[in-house]
Amino acid sequence: AVLPPQAARNPEFYEKQNLPIPTLQVVREEDDGVVISGMKMLATGAVFANEIWIGNVLPLAPDQKKQAITCSIPCNAPGLQLWSRQPMEMNCSSEFDSPLSYRYDESDSMLLCDEVKVPWERVFIHDDALLSRNIYFKTPSHAFGNHQSNVRYWSKMQLLVGLCNKVAGATGADQIPAVRETLGMLSANEAMIAGMVNGQINAFEDWPGNGYVCFNRRMMYAALEWCTQNYSHFIDELRTLCGGGVFQMPANISVMKDAEL
């Protein structure tokens, strides 16, 4: 959980209203640790975890030292609540209708801390607004995280290409030259992100040094930009190929068990 709540990113609003700032921060120090209160988002998979990392990936003002806390806390820490969104699989009645969400889920959680005690041995950064963010960018941390984002996009691109191919095949549209050209374009773009991901690995950097290496950051950020610019276009192509076919489907597969139908 490394982001403050969206509505709490301007502390001046709360100060003018004489209201407590909801962003997670240190409320006091004690001999054996610190006490934190407030909210942080979004801890992906926190409900399945044992420990949660708390930090700051957005820049903090120099006077926001108390919000600069970086630490880890157990998920059963007294005073900690996890506000999780509704799991997707709760609405999946069958594997056929929802093949992905029937098997998997990705549940993000809001962290709400109410006087949570953090021992000093679990505190990594305290009262240093600049270092609180720099630990991600002055080390390979951000490179590993963003490379993983590229790999996720590659997997998603493979899924999209497969879906487009299945949709076109089911409707017979794959025999139309223009549609075949679109499928070829999508396949070529899947190969492109594959090349970008492998390039980051094969053209690795000798950084931070001393025998350690890192993914090629220049190629990594180029891939992130490419993914951002092209994703909506690929989704639009899938929608175009689907056409009105999705409206021909019944509410769920249970109708196939009706003898009269």
Spell out what each predicted region is.
Residues 5-149:
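FAD-binding core of flavoproteins
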Residues 45, 64, 106, 157-160, ...:
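Active-site-proximal structural scaffolding
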Residues 148-206:
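Extended amphipathic alpha-helical segments enriched in small hydrophobics
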Residues 180-184, 214-221:
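Short, charged, amphipathic alpha-helical segments
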Residues 200-210, 248, 252-255:
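Active/binding-pocket-proximal capping segment
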Residues 218-261:
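Alpha-helix capping/hinge segments and adjacent helical runs
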